[in-house]
Curated annotation (Swiss-Prot):
Oligomeric form and interacting partners: F-type ATPases have 2 components, CF(1) - the catalytic core - and CF(0) - the membrane proton channel. CF(1) has five subunits: alpha(3), beta(3), gamma(1), delta(1), epsilon(1). CF(0) has three main subunits: a, b and c.
InterPro entries: ATP_F1_dsu/esu_C_sf, ATP_synth_F1_dsu/esu, ATP_synth_F1_dsu/esu_N, ATP_synth_F1_esu_C, ATPsynth_dsu/esu_N
Family: Belongs to the ATPase epsilon chain family.
Localization per record: Cell membrane
CDD domains xrefs: F1-ATPase_delta
PANTHER family associated with the record: ATP SYNTHASE DELTA/EPSILON CHAIN, ATP SYNTHASE EPSILON CHAIN, CHLOROPLASTIC
Gene3D superfamilies (alphabetical): ATP synthase delta/epsilon subunit, C-terminal domain, F0F1 ATP synthase delta/epsilon subunit, N-terminal
GO molecular function: ATP binding; proton-transporting ATP synthase activity, rotational mechanism
Record's protein name: ATP synthase epsilon chain
Amino acid sequence: MNKFKLIVTTPERVLISGEVSRVLCKNAVGEFEILAGHQPYLTATVPTVTRIDDENGESKYLFTSTGLMKVQNNEVTFCVNSAEWPEEIDEARAMNAKQRAEERLKNKTDELDKKRAKLALARAMSRLKLKEM
């Protein structure tokens, strides 16, 4: 199976740095897939559950937040604001964040507040989705 190097990093730590066979992620346009030999590509990511298939084809799942993803020379680098493995997610905290975001969306009329609340809701929903997997 063809493989490539994947690095997922946040301002605090590196979550993964190793060989993988596939990455499935999401940007503002929709879901996309990266395989070995992918053309150079740069995109902004949105909060989602990112699927990582290791070199044996086994899948791992990771919450990735907003950030950038770069593909170049058979290497994929995620620089995201936050990322968590399923066992690191605090489900109660994510539920509280979801409820706060939904309340903010109901009560705020300011566009900036709406955008922030939608982003917070997307982060919370992605974390909860991953926790349920």
